[in-house]
Swiss-Prot record:
NCBIfam families linked: PRK00504.1, PRK00595.1, rpmG_bact
Protein name per Swiss-Prot or TrEMBL: Large ribosomal subunit protein bL33
Source organism: Caldicellulosiruptor saccharolyticus (strain ATCC 43494 / DSM 8903 / Tp8T 6331)
Stored PROSITE patterns: RIBOSOMAL_L33
Key words, A-Z: Ribonucleoprotein, Ribosomal protein
InterPro entries with a match to the protein in the record: Ribosomal_bL33, Ribosomal_bL33_CS, Ribosomal_bL33_sf, Ribosomal_zn-bd
Length: 54
């Protein structure tokens, strides 16, 4: 059987309202630190910083 890949599904949480708005994949070997992206939050109705959660 083939080995399982290094890519994991992560959730992105808005830093202002704490809602988990996005899911994405990342490679844990290439990017061991937490991901931070500025994305649109539909609850805040503006672009905010979203951080990776478990």
């Amino acid at each position: 059987m083939a080995a399982k890949g290094a890519r994991m599904i992560i959730h992105l949480e808005c830093t202002e309202c704490k809602n988990r708005n996005y899911t994405t994949e990342k490679n844990k070997k290439n990017d061991p630190d937490r991901l931070e992206l500025r994305k649109y939050c539909k609850f805040c109705r503006k672009h905010t910083l979203h951080r990776e959660t478990k």
